[in-house]
């Protein structure tokens, strides 16, 4: 293609959306590398310590959209210390100094401050989209800066963040000239909401397609918001624990009947059962339903709601739905592609007889032939059930099974679940993400290494017998990018068997395993392009006291590839070898 002008090649590159494919294109020749450098507008960085912002900007000076991840995935399970790192401020400072035309920023598991948000809002004149997922460190003062200064804002999406509500009036900071908003999600905010300011904002946003409210927005306000935004496609409702008065209910019904375009519904943080019938008219068009926080919707009310959603492709639900409820899903939702079943009692404090089991999983797999992604928290499982699921749904690309009790065997035969998970990886040739649990031996990892050729991310908890289990995975899964292990018997022999393997991976996490400080030191000596972090939260003992005892087991090991060396913001309890 050397005879094509650069402009033509650049136009061809515009049709290549995959970050992985764009990376491959840039390696073909110097000419393509240069063209890709100046034409790349979107960049994804899965680890904020793999590169620094200055190097990123030199590589892609025309950057407009940046996705950045901070803490490891196990931070979602409270396994990463609170102040470990993942600070976004150095990135925003560098981007501001470089004067790149940043328009979109997506952050996940990062520390974001009000100062960072204020700098972001003042540095990029055409900034349009901010998405924060599982972030912490900021308040509504920072959101007020974004609202006041980002005059072209189209998207403000706040998901699962820890936000201090210093000022409930942040919505009032959107100027009257702000009419560009297309997506607004503040469901994770716990404080009061300026309903009047919200109504004015929604009324002057004709292109608003997605609106997700927090629990402070009352039912009568919801009706008014829906009346002035009938174009919504995605709606997240708040908390309605009191029975509605007839007038409010009638207004809500009138507004909902106009919603012919709505395709996604979520929320219901608390809800009175009599409120639900108002939403029945829109259920027939829904393709996405998220009830993962709707603990109050149970029994016949939940079943009735599900039975009306015949076109669902995506369902997030609590395990209180029970196996009978999942059977209704299987009989009703023939287009279902993604299912997530979350635990309603995460601490195990209740005798939850409604929890789902292998019966519900088999029913779903038999009734939903298009299913390709599942997250399933359950109290028990059998090999026979997993074998049936593998036969019914061979198109899984994500299969995450979390049995709530560690080391729990097949509850009928009392055998390990090796054969069941083995059937999954054998049948599902396109499997890219897998989480395993229950009683598992090294045999299951032999199966994974042999058959999971496309696997990119594997999560292991309380599993395995010896170092062989981890070696089977590392030797067999050539496309593995992220491997995370907790409370398993893998040690130095597995860690050090093929150090070069980690050069092709994004990261390795091991906590409460058999790895020692000496093993980590040897790994670091042989891997100059890897950061080897030892995390010891027990500051009373002090890391210095144990650092010379190479037989000392490490609490947590986080290993990741980097091109910029050791990070400078590690807290005292993190030692980088």
Curated annotation (Swiss-Prot):
Q: What function is annotated for this protein?
A: Confers sensitivity to the virulent bacterial pathogen P.syringae. Component of SCF(ASK-cullin-F-box) E3 ubiquitin ligase complexes, which may mediate the ubiquitination and subsequent proteasomal degradation of target proteins. Auxin receptor that mediates Aux/IAA proteins proteasomal degradation and auxin-regulated transcription. Involved in embryogenesis regulation by auxin.
Identify the tissues in which this protein is expressed: Ubiquitous, with higher levels in flowers.
* Cellular compartments annotated: Nucleus
Q: Name one GO biological process term.
A: lateral root development
Positions binding 1D-myo-inositol hexakisphosphate in this chain are: 69, 108-109, 340, 398-400, 433, 481-482, 506
Q: Kindly summarize what the UniProt induction comment says about this protein's expression.
A: Repressed by miR393a (microRNA) in response to flg-22 (flagellin-derived peptide 22).
What SMART domains does this protein's entry cite?
FBOX (SM00256)
The highest taxon in the source lineage is Eukaryota
Q: Give the quaternary structure.
A: Part of a SCF (SKP1-cullin-F-box) protein ligase complex. Interacts with CUL1 and SKP1A/ASK1. Interacts with Aux/IAA proteins (IAA7 and IAA12) in an auxin-dependent manner.
Its cellular-component GO annotations read: nucleus; SCF ubiquitin ligase complex
Q: Which GO terms describe its molecular function?
A: auxin binding; inositol hexakisphosphate binding
Give the pathway.
Answer: Protein modification; protein ubiquitination
Gene designation? AFB3
Q: Which UniProt keywords apply?
A: Auxin signaling pathway, Developmental protein, Nucleus, Plant defense, Ubl conjugation pathway
Give the protein name, as stated in the record.
Protein AUXIN SIGNALING F-BOX 3
């Amino acid at each position: 293609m050397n005879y094509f002008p650069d402009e033509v090649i650049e136009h061809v590159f515009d049709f290549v959306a995959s970050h992985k494919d764009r990376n491959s294109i840039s390696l073909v020749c110097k000419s393509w590398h240069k063209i890709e450098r100046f034409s790349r507008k979107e960049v994804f960085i899965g680890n904020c310590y793999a590169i620094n912002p200055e190097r990123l900007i030199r590589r892609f000076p025309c950057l407009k959209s940046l996705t950045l991840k901070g803490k490891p995935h196990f931070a979602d399970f409270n396994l990463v210390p609170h102040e470990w790192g993942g600070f976004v401020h150095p990135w925003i400072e560098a981007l501001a100094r470089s004067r790149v035309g940043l328009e979109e920023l997506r952050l996940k598991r990062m520390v974001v401050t009000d100062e960072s948000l204020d700098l972001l809002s003042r540095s990029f004149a055409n900034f349009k989209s901010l998405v924060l997922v599982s972030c912490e460190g900021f308040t509504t003062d920072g959101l007020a800066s974004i609202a006041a200064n980002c005059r072209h804002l189209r998207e403000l999406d706040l998901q699962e963040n820890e936000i201090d509500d210093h000022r409930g009036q942040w919505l009032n900071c959107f100027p009257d000239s702000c009419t560009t908003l297309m997506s607004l999600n503040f469901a994770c905010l716990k404080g009061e909401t300026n309903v009047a300011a919200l109504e004015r904002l929604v009324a002057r946003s004709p292109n608003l397609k997605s609106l997700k409210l927090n629990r402070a927005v009352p039912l009568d306000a919801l009706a008014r918001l829906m009346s002035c935004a009938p174009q919504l496609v995605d709606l997240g409702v708040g908390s309605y624990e009191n029975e509605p008065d007839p007038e409010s209910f009638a207004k809500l019904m009138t507004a909902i009947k106009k919603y012919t375009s709505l395709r996604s519904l979520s929320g219901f943080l608390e809800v009175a059962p009599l409120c639900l019938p108002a939403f029945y008219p829109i259920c027939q068009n829904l393709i996405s339903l998220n009830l993962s926080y709707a603990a109050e919707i149970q029994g016949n009310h939940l079943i009735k709601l599900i039975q009306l959603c015949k076109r669902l492709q995506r369902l997030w639900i609590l395990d209180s739905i029970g196996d009978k409820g999942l059977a209704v899903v299987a009989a009703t939702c023939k287009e279902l592609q993604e299912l997530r079943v979350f635990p309603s009692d995460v601490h195990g404090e209740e005798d939850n007889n409604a929890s789902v089991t292998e019966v519900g999983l088999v029913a779903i797999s038999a009734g939903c032939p298009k299913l390709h992604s599942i997250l399933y928290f359950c109290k028990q499982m059998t090999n026979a059930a997993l074998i049936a699921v593998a036969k019914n749904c061979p198109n899984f690309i994500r299969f995450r099974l979390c049995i709530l009790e560690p080391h729990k065997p097949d509850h009928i035969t009392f055998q390990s679940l090796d054969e069941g998970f083995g059937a999954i990886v054998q049948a599902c040739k396109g499997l890219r993400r897998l989480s395993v649990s229950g009683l598992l031996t090294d045999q299951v990892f032999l199966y994974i290494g042999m058959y999971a050729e496309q696997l990119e991310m594997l999560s292991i908890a309380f599993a395995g017998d010896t170092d062989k289990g981890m070696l089977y995975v590392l030797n067999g899964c050539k496309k593995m990018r992220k491997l995370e292990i907790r409370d398993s018997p893998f040690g130095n022999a597995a860690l050090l068997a093929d150090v070069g393997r980690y050069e092709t991976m994004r990261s390795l996490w091991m906590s409460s395993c058999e790895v020692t400080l000496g093993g980590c030191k040897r790994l670091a000596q042989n891997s100059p392009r890897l950061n080897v972090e030892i995390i010891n939260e027990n500051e009373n003992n002090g890391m210095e006291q144990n650092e010379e005892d190479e037989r000392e087991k490490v609490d947590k090991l986080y290993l990741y590839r980097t091109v910029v060396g050791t990070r400078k913001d590690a807290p005292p309890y993190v030692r980088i070898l």
